[in-house]
Amino acid sequence: DYDGTIRYSWTLDQLAAATELPAGPEHDGLVFQEWNWSLENLKATNRKMNVGATYTTDDGTTRVYIHLQEGRTSPMMGLGVNGTVTVDWGDGTTPDTLTGTSVSTTVWTPTHEYAAPGDYVIRLTVDGTMGFVGTSTSNQYSCILRYSSSTDARNTVYRNAVRKIEIGNGVTSIGASAFQACYTLAYITMPKSLTSIGSYTFNGCFLLASITIPDSVTSIGNSAFTSCYTLASITIPDSVTSISGYAFYFCNTLASITIPDSVTSIGSSTFQNCNTLASITIPDSVTSIGSSAFNGCYTLAYITISDSVTSIGDSAFKACNTLASITIPDSVTSIGSSAFNGCYTLAYITMPKSLTSIGNYAFQNCYPLASITIPDSVTSIGASAFQACNTLASITIPDSVTSIGSSAFQNCYSIRYFDFTNHTAVPTLSNTNAFTGIPADCEIRVPAALYDEWIAATNWSTYASQIVAV
């Protein structure tokens, strides 16, 4: 439900047998519209999925619940209006009327003077269409409730007066920064008339614990839920095709999320620093995982990457400290820089045969990684790619590898040998520190026919005493 309450829970067998979805929840003042997934699409997906209820208000008005402090009783409101919006301030005074021609252009009410602090419900009646609007400028942000239409530190007090929003008829968009820095906004219901959620929309809504996105929404904007520290539940419908960068950045309480099959890309830093995210399945529709997408997801222990993914971005899984194993599908051709850097418990990884490059720092500080097979499609090993893989015992470098970056195997303290015996040419060694810190008895095994050339080659000569002809 919109407040995070689990109303029903089905197994996949129960889903397969179902002929209709359950009845919607009932709430005073709200009218259930629909679940944000259809039964048909749930059955087609046939995997774990969170489903949420969408509502409109029983009288069609949009309600903004506020709590005003002593000495802070003079707010104004900015809205995007295409037509007219009547603003009933909830204190028995004469309503204000706003007129406009665009849901993305802000129209301001006059300053309203409340007679006393306390709790009020502002009701917005829309004739036409309306959007919520904001700006990313410091000391402005959301226009939902402010002291001034321009920059003023007192705007923060009024934004923080907003506690709950129930969206009614006529609202089609929640624009960029629409509720940004509404620190005490704890609940919101959104109807199926909504078509877009803009960038920074809920950025910094610290108390927002749960949200249901209607199935009319197709995209989640950049940083839309950044720093929603208590957001524990979100239901994404299969109408959403893209989740932009930083969308859930620093959502520290988000323990699980289901990505629908409609999503084709996961943007940069989308789930970065979601510290309690424990597992995630990336659907077949996703073709790319952006840089730092799961960086700092310390409790991420399980992830399934579909065979539609072709690239894993820089730092994509960096510092996923609980990730013990991962299989990279054959569709992936590149692993970005620092992709798995600092995955301290990563002991097993399967690399695809399609892989052509291993980026800089890709597996740096993967301390328990004991073995790895580099496919013969790889042509380059980046700088510090396996630096400080302290448990790595041996590795075979295929003939396809033509260059090895600086510090690539530095401080691999347990390694017994490097196998280059299938090489037909000496690969380029970028720096003399490529093997710094390996044990004194570690062998660099090379073909006997190339031995003399190998020990004389640039930077390889540093390790002449450890190069062994086989």
What is the role of each PLM region?
Residues 26-31, 79-85:
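Short proline/glycine-enriched turn/loop motifs at strand-loop junctions of beta-rich domains
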Residues 8-14, 41, 121-127, 158-173, ...:
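Structural signature of tandem-repeat unit edges
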Residues 175-180, 198-206, 221-226, 244-249, ...:
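Consensus positions within tandem repeat domains that build extended binding/scaffold surfaces
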Residues 1, 32-35, 53, 87, ...:
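Extracellular/surface recognition and adhesion modules
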Residues 56-80, 127-167:
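Extracellular ectodomain segments of secreted/surface proteins
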Residues 10-13, 95-104:
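Solvent-exposed serine/threonine-rich low-complexity stretches and specific carbohydrate-binding patches
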Residues 1-58, 126, 141, 145:
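Secondary-structure capping and domain/repeat boundary segments
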Residues 102-116, 120:
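Residue-level recognition of secondary-structure-to-loop junctions
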